[in-house]
Protein backbone atom coordinates (compact mmCIF):
# COMPACT_ATOMS: atom_id res chain seq x y z
CA UNK A 1 0.00 0.00 0.00
CA UNK A 2 1.38 3.41 -0.91
CA UNK A 3 0.91 6.11 1.69
CA UNK A 4 1.76 9.75 1.09
CA UNK A 5 4.66 10.89 3.22
CA UNK A 6 3.38 12.40 6.40
CA UNK A 7 4.75 13.16 9.81
CA UNK A 8 7.78 11.13 10.84
CA UNK A 9 7.85 10.35 14.53
CA UNK A 10 11.58 9.99 15.18
CA UNK A 11 13.21 7.31 17.26
CA UNK A 12 11.92 3.82 17.78
CA UNK A 13 11.84 1.56 20.78
CA UNK A 14 14.69 -0.46 19.31
CA UNK A 15 16.81 2.62 18.57
CA UNK A 16 17.32 1.63 14.92
CA UNK A 17 15.33 4.39 13.26
CA UNK A 18 11.86 2.89 13.61
CA UNK A 19 9.21 5.53 13.21
CA UNK A 20 5.58 5.97 12.37
CA UNK A 21 4.40 7.56 9.16
CA UNK A 22 1.03 9.14 9.79
CA UNK A 23 -1.50 10.48 7.33
CA UNK A 24 -4.96 11.26 8.65
CA UNK A 25 -6.12 8.26 10.63
CA UNK A 26 -3.81 5.80 8.87
CA UNK A 27 -0.64 4.99 10.78
CA UNK A 28 1.99 2.56 9.54
CA UNK A 29 5.03 1.68 11.63
CA UNK A 30 8.19 0.74 9.77
CA UNK A 31 11.86 0.09 10.40
CA UNK A 32 14.55 1.47 8.15
CA UNK A 33 17.34 -0.95 7.16
CA UNK A 34 20.40 -0.63 4.95
CA UNK A 35 21.24 -3.28 2.36
CA UNK A 36 23.99 -3.63 -0.24
CA UNK A 37 22.73 -4.37 -3.74
CA UNK A 38 24.57 -4.93 -7.03
CA UNK A 39 24.72 -1.88 -9.32
CA UNK A 40 22.46 -3.48 -11.94
CA UNK A 41 19.73 -4.09 -9.36
CA UNK A 42 19.95 -0.49 -8.14
CA UNK A 43 19.74 0.69 -11.77
CA UNK A 44 16.59 -1.42 -12.23
CA UNK A 45 15.07 -0.01 -9.04
CA UNK A 46 15.84 3.54 -10.15
CA UNK A 47 14.30 2.83 -13.58
CA UNK A 48 11.12 1.61 -11.86
CA UNK A 49 10.89 4.85 -9.88
CA UNK A 50 11.82 7.05 -12.85
CA UNK A 51 9.21 5.29 -15.00
CA UNK A 52 6.63 5.93 -12.26
CA UNK A 53 6.07 2.21 -11.68
CA UNK A 54 6.79 2.85 -7.99
CA UNK A 55 6.89 5.90 -5.74
CA UNK A 56 10.28 5.17 -4.20
CA UNK A 57 13.16 2.73 -4.02
CA UNK A 58 11.67 1.39 -0.80
CA UNK A 59 8.37 0.72 -2.58
CA UNK A 60 10.15 -1.36 -5.25
CA UNK A 61 12.00 -3.42 -2.64
CA UNK A 62 8.84 -3.87 -0.58
CA UNK A 63 6.88 -5.02 -3.64
CA UNK A 64 9.56 -7.61 -4.46
CA UNK A 65 9.71 -8.90 -0.89
CA UNK A 66 5.93 -9.14 -0.64
CA UNK A 67 5.85 -11.09 -3.90
CA UNK A 68 8.53 -13.49 -2.59
CA UNK A 69 6.60 -13.94 0.65
CA UNK A 70 3.41 -14.78 -1.27
CA UNK A 71 5.36 -17.21 -3.49
CA UNK A 72 6.73 -19.05 -0.46
CA UNK A 73 3.29 -19.23 1.15
CA UNK A 74 1.86 -20.65 -2.08
CA UNK A 75 4.71 -23.16 -2.23
CA UNK A 76 3.96 -24.22 1.35
CA UNK A 77 0.26 -24.56 0.52
CA UNK A 78 1.10 -26.69 -2.52
CA UNK A 79 3.24 -28.98 -0.35
CA UNK A 80 0.40 -29.33 2.15
CA UNK A 81 -2.00 -30.17 -0.66
CA UNK A 82 0.42 -32.72 -2.10
CA UNK A 83 0.94 -34.50 1.21
CA UNK A 84 -2.59 -34.29 2.60
CA UNK A 85 -4.78 -35.30 -0.32
CA UNK A 86 -5.37 -38.85 -1.37
CA UNK A 87 -4.86 -40.17 -4.88
CA UNK A 88 -8.63 -40.12 -5.38
CA UNK A 89 -8.76 -36.36 -4.82
CA UNK A 90 -10.72 -36.67 -1.58
CA UNK A 91 -10.20 -33.51 0.45
CA UNK A 92 -11.33 -34.94 3.80
CA UNK A 93 -7.74 -35.44 4.93
CA UNK A 94 -6.84 -31.89 3.93
CA UNK A 95 -9.89 -30.50 5.73
CA UNK A 96 -8.84 -32.36 8.88
CA UNK A 97 -5.33 -30.96 8.60
CA UNK A 98 -6.69 -27.43 8.18
CA UNK A 99 -8.93 -27.83 11.21
CA UNK A 100 -5.91 -28.79 13.35
CA UNK A 101 -3.58 -26.07 12.01
CA UNK A 102 -3.30 -22.75 13.83
CA UNK A 103 -3.75 -19.76 11.56
CA UNK A 104 -0.79 -17.40 11.21
CA UNK A 105 -2.79 -14.18 11.20
CA UNK A 106 -1.47 -10.89 12.52
Curated annotation (Swiss-Prot):
GO BP, sorted A to Z: detoxification; negative regulation of growth
Gene Ontology MF annotations: toxin sequestering activity
Induction: Mildly induced (about 4-fold) when grown in a non-replicating state.
Transmembrane segments: none
Subunit annotation: Forms a complex with cognate toxin MazF3, possibly with 1:1 stoichiometry.
Known role: Antitoxin component of a type II toxin-antitoxin (TA) system. Upon expression in E.coli and M.smegmatis neutralizes the effect of cognate toxin MazF3. Overexpression of MazE3 alone decreased persister cells formation in M.smegmatis upon challenge with gentamicin or kanamycin.
The name this protein goes by in its record: Antitoxin MazE3
